[in-house]
Amino acid sequence: MSEAVVAIHFKDMSVDETVRDLVERRCADLADEFPELTHLDVTLAPDGSGHHASVHGTGKRTEVASHAQAPALGHAADLVLDQVRHQLRKVHDKHIYTQRRRAKHRAELAR
């Protein structure tokens, strides 16, 4: 399991333990899938017509942020964590494939 620090904030609302557990589990899955991740900060808040969720994640050569809105708090949290997973996948693949392209280029130059 990764050592990523997860901070979950409920802004201007009472804590919903069901949503907290869902977010903690999803963040732990993200941290396991992307070991370069060191910190995830999740903020959940009501807005005029539903709920707002935002996430900021940092790590080694990685920084992502996203936000989402939905009528239900759990749905907003799911949406924003799906967006962050997509962003982390793009960053992760970019780092891996950049290194592979460099190695391939160096091997071709060495011939």
Which residues make up each language-model segment?
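N-terminal, polar/charged subdomain of small-to-medium soluble alpha/beta proteins
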Residues: 1-111
